[in-house]
Amino acid sequence: MSDSSVREKNDNFRGYRKRGRQELRKIKRSSARTEGGSTETLEDVAEDIDHRSDEDEVSDVDSGDDFDIEDEEGKKEKVYDALLTILKSEHPEPKRRRREADESNKAPAEVGEDEHENTEHGPVDDQLEIENGLLGNHEDDNDDDSSGDEKDIDSEDEQDPFESHFNQVPEKFVDKLSNAFKTKSVKYKSVKGSLSDSESYIYAKPVVIGEEALVESPYRSSSIYSYFLKQRLKVQNGLLDKKTDPLTALQKKLVDPMFQYKDILYEYDSYEKDEDEYRDLYALHVLNHIYKTRDRILKNNQRLQDNPDTEHLDQGFTRPKVLIVVPTREVAYRVVDKIISKSGIDQVDKKGKFYDQFRDDSLPPKSKPKSFQHIFRGNTNDFFVVGLKFTRKAIKLYSNFYQSDIIVCSPLGIQMILENTDKKKRQDDFLSSIELMVIDQLHSIEYQNISHIFTIFDHLNKIPDQQHEADFSRIRMWYINEQAKLFRQTMVFTKYISPAANSLINGRCRNMAGRWKNHKVIGSENSSIGQSGLKIRQIFQRFDIIGNSIIEEPDYRFKFFTSVIIPGIVKSTGYEDGILIYIPDYTDFIRIRNYMKEKTTILFGDINEYSSQRQLNANRSLFQQGRLKVMLYTERLHHYRRYEIKGVKSVVFYKPPNNPEFYNEVVRFIGKNAFLGNTDLNISTVRCIYSKLDGLSLERIVGTKRAAVLSHAQKEIYEFK
């Protein structure tokens, strides 16, 4: 839908031209009543109740002429209904896919709650806290939304990526690319480059098929000084002296694609150091975006006061511009604390409440692996949504979602709002205008419920169902035309790139600026096998997928397992007991368990993430005693508990673990049993079945070069020792 056609339709519904701009602006209460005693409006009452503490703050919105508020609201509702009718007729909403709810889609918060969850507030309190974030849309209407001094207003330099990405793209180009995505006539042109001897990157940009386009590397000088930062951020973060080099090696890799608004999928090395460094950078980027957005609106407010007939498109349907998704309250605390420290704002409302609910100094047992201690330290509650609003004087935590600039949430917390069982409580309008999305620690989120992440993407950048006081005269056309996904930047940070991570960045992101991701080259000495330290037979068996059908891959794997591996267990020339079968996916686990119950006479037990503590203890004990010959063990249980399974003599990996640390931890079960004299390493075996689709996991276990050979060579069985 073109700019002119939409505006003509909107004007026809209003019944006038240009004058509607003045009428659609927010209404501001007069500072004093006339002596005649004018009646108090509903807005006055709401402000008196909710904002007695904010009387000293001045609204940033322009004051309109005095007129009846109820009539004005009625006009605005009619305009909005008319606009929705137009939009829905031109952009019919696709039918939602029905999701099958089975055990595999349950939230994993229930796993290991007794060991790791440290929650001072019950689930009911947490749910009420989240629901309160949707109430009281007018709670902060009197706040001054200015983020700093007037001197720090943007210069609107066309070289600023904020300007070129959001404000300078021709409407015809956006329409053409949007239609190309709808008709699947888009291809990605890519360039590759080296970051170091052991790391490379690939940058790909969407191009309409049949058109020529030059795709260049995003790298400039790998310097923060190449970008237009707000002055208050430079002062707060010591970035005034260009002679200094404040960026780390990791930040130099990310600064160019990040500040150019490219989508990012970044695989990092160190839990502690790397996470702190990339959060430093994206916190700065997020703040810069928020400040520029709010200052642009303030600047245009002043322009409209001087000349009401001018047109300034600078807003979305709702205020929230940044969504940050993290796995636990501990990570949320670290992210929010980082944003506060870099903001240059001293006053933080409800900071004490936030620290009480999110901060926790408790640590997991020191006997657990270091990665476990990092992931499960502090407050591991995974049910929360918090809004952050930036005003001239303060950062307001726990702000109403529709009045927030940044929303920090867990997948489970926001899922409760988006897919609430009570349809009256479902809302997603506050996600309609998200321009930056960050997914932090995706590798941890994958063990919670990755489907929640895909649900979030389903609800991003949609036309809202309600008005939410939007000023339609200032909404950008690409919002109205449902093209906001072409402008949204998505940044995903993970310890290990997985098929799910690739699916998100490749399948759910349409950023016209393109996508950037790195690739680690893993030498054999740094692989899991190279670091295991055990001289034990490790056999990798490949099964082929006929027709290269990804959808049918689980069926081919199951068929291979039941026709090759199970008979091998029954007729084993090695140990007949102490066999641990490690299964990453819960649906595969259910399938194998049912098969072994119904089709075999093998004496086996199982432990999984939904087992009771009594079942876990009993089956582990029976397996150690040899009374159970085979034990089925799920990866999610291992992630949440990191059990030391005793009595293991041989291991079968139904699929390579996504986390290479898990491979070594499970193999060492055999080593510890051998140390006790209960097994012989010359007889014990480790067997891993894989397909060429397991390449990402495989290269972390055997190394990049070996993984290429294992995946593509004619030989199907490889052995390491």
Curated annotation (Swiss-Prot):
Q: Name one Pfam family in it.
A: UTP25_NTPase-like
Concerning InterPro entries, the annotation shows:
P-loop_NTPase, UTP25, UTP25_C, UTP25_NTPase-like
One Gene Ontology term, aspect cellular component: nucleoplasm
- Superkingdom is Eukaryota
GO BP terms: namely: maturation of SSU-rRNA; maturation of SSU-rRNA from tricistronic rRNA transcript (SSU-rRNA, 5.8S rRNA, LSU-rRNA); ribosomal small subunit biogenesis
**Chain intervals with Basic and acidic residues compositional bias:** 1-14, 88-105
Residue positions where Phosphoserine is found in the record: S53, S63, S196
Major localisation: nucleus
Composition skew (Basic residues), residue ranges: 15-31
Residue ranges for the region (Disordered) are: 1-168
Q: Which SUPFAM superfamilies match?
A: P-loop containing nucleoside triphosphate hydrolases (SSF52540)
* Keywords assigned by UniProt, alphabetized: Nucleus, Phosphoprotein, Ribonucleoprotein, Ribosome biogenesis, rRNA processing
In its UniProt record, a GO molecular function of this protein is: U3 snoRNA binding
Q: What does this protein do?
A: DEAD-box RNA helicase-like protein required for pre-18S rRNA processing, specifically at sites A0, A1, and A2.
Q: What else is known?
A: Present with 172 molecules/cell in log phase SD medium.
What's this protein's family per the entry? Belongs to the UTP25 family.
Q: Assembly state and interactors?
A: Interacts with snoRNA U3. Interacts with MPP10, NOP19, RRP9, UTP8 and UTP18. Component of the ribosomal small subunit (SSU) processome composed of at least 40 protein subunits and snoRNA U3.
Name of the featured protein: U3 small nucleolar RNA-associated protein 25
Name the source organism: Saccharomyces cerevisiae (strain ATCC 204508 / S288c) (Baker's yeast)
The lineage is: Eukaryota, Fungi, Dikarya, Ascomycota, Saccharomycotina
Gene name per UniProt: UTP25
